Design a protein with these regions (language model features):
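Bacterial N-terminal signal peptides
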Residues: 5-14
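Hydrophobic membrane-targeting and insertion signals
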Residues: 3-5, 18-21
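Low-complexity, acidic/polar, glycine-enriched regions of mature
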Residues: 19-187
Length: 187
């Protein structure tokens, strides 16, 4: 019984150590730049970014954990366009996997996972509209006080995620949108 207690205490200590090493998202801004087929573009914005990541315990360069965006909060600045975006294209009411965009298995390239700082690139698994695909993009990580400020950008090809072509009265959004994210993380 004594050895079982020691194992449980060791596992609890390891879990606490990993949790203490986690980077937790604080304030964040997500902008999805949507280029229009007739020229110009509009932004869909939200601050509903959450999550935490931890350097992988397995020694992999990828982080454990994930970052998530509540797609029900995306705002384009026009009520009818918001309704069409959420109901007709993202279909957020279909539930889990549709109401949230999640980035996981984030692998920083050119930056140390233990003390990331500077410019580099990343790869990760993005789940949107119930579909998971690899995305890659640029990342810039800067130390700010006791935490980090992260900015990242990456393209998303809407047909890859089985999202219908956004069209209304002959005007539409091109297939590829650009996601720009800025957020703070602390331990």
């Amino acid at each position: 019984m004594k050895s079982l207690t020691l194992i449980v205490l060791a596992l609890a200590g390891a879990t606490t150590a990993v949790a203490a090493n986690a980077w937790r998202v604080g304030q964040g801004d997500v902008h999805v730049i949507c280029p229009m087929t007739v020229g110009g573009s509009f932004d869909a914005k939200t601050t509903a970014l959450s999550g935490s990541v931890t350097p992988s315990a397995s020694g992999s360069p990828a982080f454990d954990g994930s970052l998530a965006v509540d797609l029900r909060t995306l705002d384009t600045g026009i009520g009818l366009r918001n309704e069409h975006l959420r109901e007709n294209y993202l279909e957020v009411d279909k539930g889990t996997g549709f109401d949230t965009a999640t980035l996981s298995e984030i692998d920083l390239k050119g930056l140390s996972p233990d003390a990331p700082e500077g410019k580099g690139s990343f790869a990760g698994l993005l789940t949107v509209h119930g579909v998971t695909k690899t995305v890659t993009g640029a990342v810039d990580v800067r130390r700010v006080g006791a935490g980090l400020r992260v900015t990242a950008s990456f393209p998303v090809n809407l047909p890859d995620y089985s999202i219908r072509k956004p069209r209304y009265l002959g005007v539409g959004v091109k297939d590829v949108v650009q996601v720009e994210v800025a957020f703070s993380v602390t331990r």
